[in-house]
A protein has these predicted regions:
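Active-site region of chymotrypsin-like
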Residues: 51-59, 85-167
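Serine endopeptidase catalytic core focused on the charge-relay Asp
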Residues: 1-98, 126-128
């Protein structure tokens, strides 16, 4: 979305400051839903801007975002995360309910075979050039493997009346 980005709801609360890679303030949480859902959105300002790409972390080229058509079960999907970078797998299930270790219950998640680790939460999922969602959580790690769940992006956009920023 222009002027902001979507992320996991467990990453912040409305009004919370968000900081960039250089530790300067880049924006503010405008909304967050957690638990029940796991999504939020951040408005950017102070010299920051958004681009319609998913960061490839030097492993692959950054992926242009051209839409948000939902990938079917069995489709290839990749994830970008600030801890582990770029990883790919397949869509395994949809509209799943997850009971996290802390007792939080989240509904409507998509399950994938993509690995993730702590700090990857809120990172983007993409299938081809279609945005899929943001990392909620999972089990395992990127050494031994595992599964992750993401909150579908179209639900987030709809919840806040946002429009996806596309290339």
């Amino acid at each position: 979305m222009r002027g902001g980005f979507v992320t996991a709801g467990h990453c912040g609360q409305p009004g919370a400051a968000v900081y960039g890679w250089d530790r300067s303030r880049l924006g503010t949480f405008e909304g967050a839903s957690w638990p029940g859902n796991d999504y939020g959105w951040v408005s950017v300002g102070h010299g920051w801007w958004t681009e319609p790409v998913v960061l490839g972390w030097g492993t692959v080229s950054d992926a242009l975002v051209r839409g948000s058509a939902e990938a079917p079960i069995g489709a290839s999907v990749c994830r970008s995360g600030s801890t582990t970078g770029w990883h790919c797998g397949t869509v395994l299930g949809k509209n799943e309910t997850v009971n996290y270790v802390g007792g939080e219950v989240v509904h409507g998640l998509t399950r994938t075979s993509v690995c993730a680790q702590g700090g990857d939460s809120g990172g983007s999922y993409i299938s081809g050039d279609q945005a899929q969602g943001v990392t909620s959580g999972g089990w395992g790690d990127c050494t031994g493997g595992g599964e992750t769940w993401h909150q579908p992006v179209n639900e987030i956009l709809s919840a806040y009346g946002l429009t996806l920023h596309t290339a």
